Amino acid sequence: MKCFAQIVVLLLVIAFSHGAVITGVCDRDAQCGSGTCCAASAFSRNIRFCVPLGNNGEECHPASHKVPYNGKRLSSLCPCNTGLTCSKSGEKFQCS
């Protein structure tokens, strides 16, 4: 239980700090490497991670902003990689 509490505190410190990104946690695209964006966690929009851009056939969000985006993304999906577009395929949107 003590270890769990320490992990929770560590995650809160990381989420609310403005320091360097060490674990892939980010605030904005500029903190992520090439080929990635700072996307919201699927579990909490207050936590964001550096996530790879979408490849051919992968799910995407049609309203996702281009990279780099200076604001905070609300989606857990990054835009498609260069040369790909996010288009409807059946019930979902996919990079193609």
From Swiss-Prot:
Cite a single GO BP annotation: endothelial cell proliferation
Gene Ontology molecular function: any one: toxin activity
Please give the tissue specificity annotation from the record for this chain.
Expressed by the skin glands.
Cellular compartments per GO CC? extracellular region
Q: Main localisation, per the record?
A: secreted
What does this protein do, in the record's words?
Answer: Potent agonist for both PKR1/PROKR1 and PKR2/PROKR2, and inducer of a potent and long-lasting hyperalgesia. Also potentiates capsaicin-induced TRPV1 current, when tested on DRG neurons. At subnanomolar concentrations, this protein both induces potent chemotaxis of macrophages and stimulates LPS-induced production of the pro-inflammatory cytokines IL-1 and IL-12. In vivo, potently stimulates the contraction of the guinea-pig gastrointestinal (GI) smooth muscle (nanomolar concentration).
Family that this chain belongs to: Belongs to the AVIT (prokineticin) family.
**Name of the featured protein:** Prokineticin Bm8-a
Q: Which organism was this protein described from?
A: Bombina maxima (Giant fire-bellied toad)
